[in-house]
Amino acid sequence: MKWIVIDTIIQPSCGISFSAIWGNMKMIIWYQSTIFLPPGSIFTPVKSGIILKDKEYPITIYNIAPFNKDLWSLLKSSQECPPGESKITNKCLHNSCIIKICPYGLK
């Protein structure tokens, strides 16, 4: 089954991400990975992780739940990344970010 990413939220201090996805229904996945799942990505879940663009990546999925608009709004409002002021300077202001390559292109 292929899943399509609608939106993704990253918490850089802990490396946890949340993605709104579409499979058989709209869902929210809570996961940890070394890769970023940008909106529009299409991936297939497998036992050891996911297959994205014909390559297998490890991913730890903590939970999958039906999409809830209120929960998604709460997650978006507490999003640490990317901070608005960083867009102006192109510099990340998070000293505790554990993500090696910024998916937003910040340095």
Swiss-Prot record:
Protein name: Anti-adapter protein IraM
GO CC annotations on file: cytoplasm
Provenance organism: Escherichia coli (strain 55989 / EAEC)
Gene3D superfamilies: 2.40.50.650
InterPro entries, per database record: Anti-adapter_IraM, PmrD_sf
Localization terms from the record: Cytoplasm
Alphabetic keyword roster: Cytoplasm, Stress response
Family classification: Belongs to the IraM/RssC family.
Gene that encodes the chain: iraM
Its biological purpose: Inhibits RpoS proteolysis by regulating RssB activity, thereby increasing the stability of the sigma stress factor RpoS during magnesium starvation.
Any single GO BP term: cellular response to starvation
